Structures are given as C-alpha cells and as structure tokens.
C-alpha cells in the first residue's frame, strides 16, 4: 500500500505536468502551518527561475489543474508561491479503511529483502548485567524488530565477551580455591564432571575477586595470563572449565534478557572468531595489506579526505597476541562466510566510534567484507542519573540491571495499587508489563546517540511522554471496545466515518502517517521516531475521546465509524509498541 504522501505527490505531479511544468517540482511536505492545511508544495518557487515566471503564477496554474481532485477538499495558491493542500475527508477515511483491511496496516514493505546482521548486547560472560548493558540490548532489539517489520531478513547476534584475560582470572582463582578439582590435574585421563564446580552467584563473585588480586599481586597476574595462554592453546582441563563457565553464564544471561523481552538469534562470541584468525593474518601479510610497525602488525586506514588522524588498525601485538580489532575482523570473516549479509549494524557505545571506523575501513580495504556490504555504526549515548553522571546505586556503585528492573516494577506496583483494590497477582503482572514499558520507552524515546537522564519518577508517570501513558491509552481503547461488544455488537467490517469534528480529523491524520513513519524509522535506525509518533497519536486519541461521546452516540452509523477508528488506533499503537519491545496489559 502506498504512503499517503505518495498519493498526494502523484496527484500534484500530474497537475504540474498538465499545466506545462516539470513533474519533478511536485515535492510534497507536511505543512509548517497545520492551522491552514495538512500538506504543502513549494515546487512553484523552485521552478520560477527555469520558467522565467513569478512563483505565484506557476502555483495558480497548478491549482487550476487540481480542480475536482479526489485527494483534496481545498487547494490554494498563496504568496509568494506556496500551494496549500487540505485533504478530502472521504479520501482520508478510505485510506484508513484500506489500512484496516491489511494485516500489515498498509505498511509499504520492501520487495527486495536484505540480509541484515545486528551486533548488539555484547556482555562479558561470568559478570552480571548492569545498567550499562541496557541501551545496546533494547536499542538493538528495536532496530531488529523494525527491520523485520519492513520485510528484511535479520539475525541478532549477542557477540559475547567470552575469550581472553577474564577467563584466565577465573581459572586461576578457581584453582586457588579448589586445587583438588580434576581440571587442574595434568595426569587426569577420565571424563570431566558434567556439573559445573560453581553456581552463577559464585561465578559472579569469583571474577571481581580475581581481578582485584591481579591488580595488587604481579605473580597472581602472571599466573592468570599463563592460564589464559593455556586455555587459548587448547588445555583440556581449562577448556572444560571454560565450557562450564559458558553454560552457567549463558543460561543466566538468557533468563535476564528474557526479562527484558530481548531475544537473540545467535549466541556467538569472541571465541567463535578465533578459528578464523590464523588464516586471516596470513592472508593480510601475504597480500601486503598488513605491515609491521614498532613490532606490531597493522593495517593503514588513513584516507586523503580525513581532516584528522585515523590511527592504523592493529591486528597483532608484538608478542603475537590478538586484540579487539583482530577479533572484530575475524568475526566479519565468519559472518560474510556464513550469512552473506547485505548490511551489518553494530549497536555499541558511541565512544567506540574510532575503533569501528578503523575496523570498517580495514575490512573494506582488505576485501574481508565485499564493497557492496554496508557496515553501519549505531553509537548510543550514556544513561545518566539526575545528577547528570552515569546512573549509579544510592551508594554510588554500579547498579545491576535486574535491580533496576525490580525498582521500576516496585514503583509501578505502588502506583497501580494506590487508592484502589486490585488482586495481588494481577497487580504484580501489570506492574511487570507497565514497568517494562516505562524502562524501554524512557530510553528509546531519546535519540540513540544522545545522553539522557533516567528519571524513575518521570518514566513511571501515567501522564506525559512516557510508556505508562501510551499503555494507559491502549487500555482505555480496549475498555471501550469491550463495552461495545458487551452490547452484543460486532467489531468487524466497520467503516471509518468522514470526520465530523476537529479532534476526529486530527486522529485520522495522525493514523495516515503510520506507513511513512515506520519506513523513516527503519531508514534512519531511529526507534525514537516511533516513540514520538505514538505519543502524538495517543494525544490525538485522548483529545478525541474527551470531546466525543463514543458509546453514547445515538446515530448507530456514526458510532460504528467511531469504533472503526478506535480499532485502527489500537492496532497501530500495538504494532508500534511491539517493535519497541513491550506490550499492553488488558487492564490498568
């Protein structure tokens, strides 16, 4: 189904052509004076020079050709040459009816699906998720859902930090605590135990303890580095411990991400890239892409057009060890080989931008990634507390993500049960659902690249630009529709009215923008545009609701038109919150 702006542009283009002007001047935009009209065209001013005519004369010629158009109820040429366009009420109602009959709400899905890999999440195993992991997870999840909504094939990859020094630290500390375990017996020949020698809570305590010791004790640090080396070179006992770490940690991560309604298609990590590194390094050296600089192997990525220095991409340290850049390039080798992506999107902290500029340039320069494959950096800003500094616990420590979620749910529970009687189980379930909306909407309503303040009081409010307000609007619509059906009336096959009031018209005009908005959110990887849209849509509905006696309307045809409008509003809102990664309860 075409966007409403496409219908308008086609009508305008035909009018420009019929008036003797180039149809390419028929560019349509939303009006910057919505009190006068809904859309406008400034093409007459753009064409004035080419046709040696006053813009107002061109505008008048075009307006004359639009007489009798089914799209518009009023078209005016306004000095110095604007064409103001007011949409015909029947045209808008018919467009909405067509949206309602389409399971995709008229979404203009791509007819050329791309294979897209999204790299997001990126936690380290054996460490608890903290608030710093929130943004990558929920922004990446939303971008994935938006791309799928637009018809693309998408794989979400968590890209675990599961290889390297932290593993050596855990192995070293475990050996100190439990030296009798068979993993540390070089003469052990049997099967290693199937059960891990630690729980997730023990594992999460082992790592910081080991890390602290290594900073204070050089000999301990050397042992941890040696354990890392042995693991990476296939030590059987250490590999068995690593498998236990992965099993225990990944199961816990899956539980925590499920609580965030975040789901990954691929649970690969840095360890999966290791097998690709030797051949990749060999090729880079053999084909002259990499050279030795101060003992390290590097790829030059500076370009003539650069206005500042871009350091070389280092792929091997002087001692032969790999770096993050090595792993990221090897991961791209694996992704190209296994998935043949048209696009790879990295949802990471914006402070890592230089690193990814280096990696992307190295990948393209060396042919690791085909020239036609797009590599996209989606950098996000910091989630701050009310003091403007990175969000912390009241004691000043790093807050665990599960504790933040619990705090928000507790706040929602208080607000849901305040001055009203609600069954305990229902109140808890509703608090969980609405709390998730508070967190996700609070984050996603900000442009990804911007820092923002995580304000628990504001985000959990049922008023203003918040997730709970959006859900309250959906629940209000559900309640009206339920009452309508309780009267024994069907909610299928209903048609939207030609608008009879300003608030009804405003709601209808908000709904017709859905298609274009979703397309734009995909093109710009911008979940915040969906948030802005549904806030406007919710406001338009609530204004209509307060001005209109929907169920008390005596004219049955008119009432049915209202109900049709409500059904479509609910579907559009639910479609949008689905791609944002949360849902609405039945009651609030």
Across the structure, where does each feature detected by a protein language model lie?
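Non-catalytic interaction-recognition regions
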Residues: 1-93, 110-588
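Short, charged beta->alpha transition segments
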Residues: 101-110
């Amino acid at each position: 189904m075409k966007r409403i702006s496409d219908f308008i542009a086609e009508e305008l283009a035909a009018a420009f052509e019929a008036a003797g002007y180039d149809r390419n001047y028929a560019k349509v935009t939303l009006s910057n004076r919505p009190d006068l009209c809904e859309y406008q065209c400034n093409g007459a001013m753009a064409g004035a020079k080419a046709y040696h005519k006053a813009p107002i004369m061109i505008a008048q010629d075009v307006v004359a050709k639009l007489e009798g158009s089914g799209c518009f109820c009023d078209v005016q040429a306004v000095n110095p040459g604007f064409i103001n366009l007011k949409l015909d009420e029947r045209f808008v109602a018919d467009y909405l009816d067509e949206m309602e009959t389409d399971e995709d709400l008229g979404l203009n899905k791509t007819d050329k699906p791309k294979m897209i890999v999204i790299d997001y999440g990126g936690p380290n195993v054996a460490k608890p998720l903290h608030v710093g992991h929130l943004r990558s997870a929920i922004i990446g999840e939303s971008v994935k859902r938006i791309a799928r909504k637009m018809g693309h094939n998408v794989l979400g990859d968590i890209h675990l930090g599961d290889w390297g020094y932290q593993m050596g630290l855990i192995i070293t500390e475990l050996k100190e605590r439990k030296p009798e375990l068979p993993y540390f017996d070089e003469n052990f020949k049997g099967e290693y135990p199937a059960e891990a020698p630690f729980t997730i809570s023990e594992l999460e305590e082992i790592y910081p303890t080991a890390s602290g010791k290594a900073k204070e004790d050089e000999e301990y640090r050397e042992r941890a580095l040696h354990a890392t080396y042995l693991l990476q070179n296939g030590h059987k006992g250490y590999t068995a411990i690593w498998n236990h770490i992965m099993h225990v940690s990944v199961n816990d991560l899956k539980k925590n991400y499920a609580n965030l309604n975040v789901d990954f298609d691929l649970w690969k990590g840095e360890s999966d890239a290791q097998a690709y590194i030797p051949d990749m390094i060999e090729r880079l050296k053999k084909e002259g892409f990499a050279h030795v600089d101060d003992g390290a192997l590097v790829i030059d990525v500076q370009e003539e057009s650069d206005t500042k220095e871009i350091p070389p991409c280092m792929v091997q340290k002087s001692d032969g060890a790999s770096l993050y850049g090595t792993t990221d390039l090897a991961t791209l080798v694996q992704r190209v080989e296994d998935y043949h992506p048209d696009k790879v999107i990295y949802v990471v902290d914006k402070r890592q931008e230089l690193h990814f500029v280096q990696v992307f340039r190295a990948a393209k320069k060396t042919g690791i990634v085909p020239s036609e494959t797009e590599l996209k950096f989606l950098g996000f800003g910091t989630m701050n507390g009310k003091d403007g500094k990175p969000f912390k616990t009241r004691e000043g420590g790093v807050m665990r993500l599960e504790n933040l979620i619990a705090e928000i749910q507790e706040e929602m529970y208080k607000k849901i049960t305040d001055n009203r009687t609600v069954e305990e189980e229902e109140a808890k379930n509703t608090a969980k659902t609405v709390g998730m909306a508070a967190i996700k909407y609070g984050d996603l309503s900000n442009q990804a690249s911007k820092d923002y303040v995580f304000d628990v009081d504001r985000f959990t409010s049922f008023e203003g630009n918040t997730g709970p307000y959006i859900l309250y609007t959906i629940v209000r619509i559900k309640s009206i529709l339920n009452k309508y059906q309780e009267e024994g009336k069907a909610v299928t096959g209903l048609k939207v009215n030609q608008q009879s009031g300003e608030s009804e018209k405003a709601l209808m005009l908000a709904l017709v923008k859905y298609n274009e908005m979703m397309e734009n959110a995909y093109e710009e990887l911008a979940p915040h545009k969906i948030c802005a849209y549904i806030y406007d849509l919710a406001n338009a509905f609530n204004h209509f609701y307060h001005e209109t006696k929907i169920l008390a309307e005596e004219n049955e045809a008119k009432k049915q038109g209202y109900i049709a409008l409500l059904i479509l509003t609910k579907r559009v809102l639910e479609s949008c919150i689905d791609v944002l990664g949360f849902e609405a309860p039945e009651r609030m």
